Design a protein with these regions (language model features):
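N-terminal signal peptide c-region/cleavage motif recognized by signal peptidases
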Residues: 15, 21-23
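Hydrophobic, Leu/Ile/Phe/Ala-enriched alpha-helical segments that form helix-helix packing faces
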Residues: 99-111, 168, 211-222
Length: 222
């Protein structure tokens, strides 16, 4: 699996991923020698800038009035946790998490598929509704994976969790537009959000682990 990135605009350092991908890159080079000039399949991955936090109490169980009171009571907390979530699970962390997964295998793409991490798309209407390709590539074997949501929730009964939404677009049929395979994954959190600065590292590791599990839940369903 070859890994590329076009995220220079947001300054992502991919050194660790490059080291991890080295054996696979060697395999790709060796494979190319035996398969000739065969065109590799392409997977383009788009992380998201979307981040939301939602804290609710037992008030939400008392209809609209309770939900309104609950939202008002937790407004400041939700804003601060959303800001932290956007920073802690921003594009470079999403890429780090996805870099630990064999995306080609999980998405059932051909061996030797090149993986390119693209810059996030700010317009949600494009990322969630556009059925055409989001890059200029005209490769006949082409697919896209988009992360479209990171949602942190804290509920009075169920506790804390991270939920993510993904979209997979497979253009291998030769169509200019394709179906958007949408889905989600959700897993519990133990350390996020951190209560002190000493807990920041554990909280961010908690988020990354949950994000990875969420993707594997999604990929298993497609």
């Amino acid at each position: 699996m070859k890994i590329h990135t076009s995220l220079a605009g947001i300054g992502i350092v991919m050194a660790g991923m490059a080291l991890a991908a080295a054996p696979a890159l060697g395999q790709d080079i060796a494979g190319a020698a035996t398969t000739g000039a065969e065109t590799a399949c392409e997977l383009h991955v788009f992380p998201t800038l979307e981040g939301q936090a939602q804290t609710t109490s037992l008030l939400s169980g008392f209809g609209i009035v309770g939900a309104i009171a609950d939202a008002a009571a937790n407004k400041d907390r939700n804003i601060s946790e959303t800001d932290y979530l956007k920073e802690a699970l921003g594009p470079k962390f999403q890429i780090a998490a996805l870099g630990t997964i064999d995306l080609v295998s999980e998405l059932k793409l051909p061996a030797g598929t090149t993986v390119t991490f693209e810059a996030p798309i700010e317009d949600r209407k494009i990322s969630t509704k556009e059925k055409a390709r989001l890059t200029p590539s005209a490769a006949p074997c082409y697919a896209e994976l988009l992360v479209t949501q990171t949602l942190y929730q804290k509920k009075a009964i169920y506790g804390r969790s991270l939920n993510n939404r993904f979209i997979f677009k497979d253009f291998r049929t030769g169509k200019t537009e394709t179906n958007m395979v949408k889905g989600r994954g959700g897993n519990g959190l133990s350390h996020f959000p951190p209560k002190t600065t000493d807990e920041t590292e554990a909280a961010e590791a908690d988020l990354l682990e949950a994000f990875t599990k969420n993707f594997l839940e999604y990929s298993a369903s497609i």
